[in-house]
């Protein structure tokens, strides 16, 4: 894991430090629109510890939370951290901007824990140049004309478990209650799957090289695919896209709990949410952010769309994670 320390203001005198564990991407834009403005407003120095979800959470667990004040995590890893007792309880009185964000983002894991600062969705991308028959439904992934033409995220990725849920629906069962039936549907789907992927860049490359005609993806991948393949289109399936969120939480034992809550509130503000949306870094959850059609392109934006999402029960997924991974590998590891 790479640890990056920034003193964005370049000052020589000592300042309070706020240590944030986050991803490494879009660092320059986050520095410009969030880190530097926050440092200036509160007279602090932000120190970043970067890496992927799994590596950062594992490091936090091994250190029992020491050395980090705030942590950004995707949904399933947020649930893991809660179960491990790694978060402080949030004082919502310090998050006055909560009243301005969509209900789905306010307390996705309960009132004691941090809100979502962005919302994403899992849908389908397909190449109109290769497919004359449009894709409109999750069930279309099983079509005969898609043999060896699609890619889906691996089970261990953020969006991976939604493939199991989709397979359950295809067989008209609850994947949580009847996983054998759901994985039976995945066996049927395997003939259509050229390969599974772990990184969004891999999916974009497969589209660009004409290897696949369709893929299941998070919406943030679409701009990259569209740039490489202008004939690609995004589909929110008629059954609804799956919601995914990223959260910010204060780490258990942090000496800077109140400052951390100020940071979370800052990120939820209308100005910051709009700046980040316009920079195409994250989709906004603040309801006061107004974007035109071009500005909203590639983002998950608007109450109507967000209200149409299918929820994902990460608690139930985490209970079944080992079993699901094992069943998945039996199908796709061969």
Region roles according to the model:
Residues 88-97, 114, 142, 230-242, ...:
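Short beta-strand->loop
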Residues 120, 184-189, 197, 228-252:
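Periplasmic-binding protein-like
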Residues 15-80:
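Early extracytoplasmic/lumenal segment of secretory-pathway proteins
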Residues 77-80, 208-209, 213-231:
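A ligand-binding cleft/hinge motif common to bilobed small-molecule-binding domains
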Residues 25-31, 67-68, 72-208:
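Extracytoplasmic ligand-binding site segments that recognize negatively charged/polar headgroups
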Residues 242, 251-309:
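Mature extracytoplasmic/periplasmic domains
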Residues 293-334:
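Extracellular/periplasmic bilobal clamshell ligand-binding domains
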Residues 68-72, 196, 213-218, 234:
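Paired acidic/hydrophobic, glycine-rich loop segments that form the ligand-binding mouth/hinge
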């Amino acid at each position: 894991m790479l640890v990056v320390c920034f003193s964005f203001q370049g000052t020589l005198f000592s300042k309070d430090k706020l240590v944030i564990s986050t991803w490494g991407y879009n660092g320059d834009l986050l520095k410009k629109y969030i880190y530097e403005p926050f440092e200036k407003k509160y007279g602090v120095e932000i120190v970043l510890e970067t890496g992927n979800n799994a590596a950062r959470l594992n490091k936090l667990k091994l250190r029992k939370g020491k050395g980090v004040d705030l942590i950004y995590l995707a949904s399933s890893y947020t649930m893991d951290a809660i179960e491990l007792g790694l978060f402080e309880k949030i004082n919502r009185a310090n998050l006055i901007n909560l009243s301005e964000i969509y209900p789905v983002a306010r307390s996705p894991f309960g009132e004691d824990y941090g809100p979502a600062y962005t919302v994403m969705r899992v849908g389908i991308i397909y190449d109109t140049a290769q497919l004359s028959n449009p894709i409109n439904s999750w069930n279309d992934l099983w079509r005969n004309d898609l043999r060896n033409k699609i890619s889906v995220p691996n089970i261990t990725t953020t969006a991976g478990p939604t493939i199991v849920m989709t397979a359950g629906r295809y067989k008209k069962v609850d994947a949580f209650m009847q996983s054998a039936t759901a994985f039976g549907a995945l066996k049927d789907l395997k003939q259509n799957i050229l390969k599974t992927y772990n990184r969004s860049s891999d999916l974009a490359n497969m589209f660009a090289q004409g290897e696949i005609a369709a893929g299941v993806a998070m919406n943030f991948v679409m701009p990259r695919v569209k740039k490489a393949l202008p004939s690609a289109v995004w589909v929110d399936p008629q059954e609804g896209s799956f919601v995914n969120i990223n959260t910010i939480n204060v780490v258990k034992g942090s000496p800077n709990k109140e400052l951390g809550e100020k940071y979370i509130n800052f990120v939820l503000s209308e100005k910051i949410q709009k700046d980040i949306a316009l920079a195409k870094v994250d989709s906004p959850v603040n309801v006061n952010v107004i974007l035109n059609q071009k500005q909203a392109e590639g983002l998950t934006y608007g109450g109507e769309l967000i209200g149409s999402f299918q929820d994902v029960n990460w608690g139930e997924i985490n209970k079944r994670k080992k079993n699901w991974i094992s069943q998945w590998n039996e199908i796709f590891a061969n």
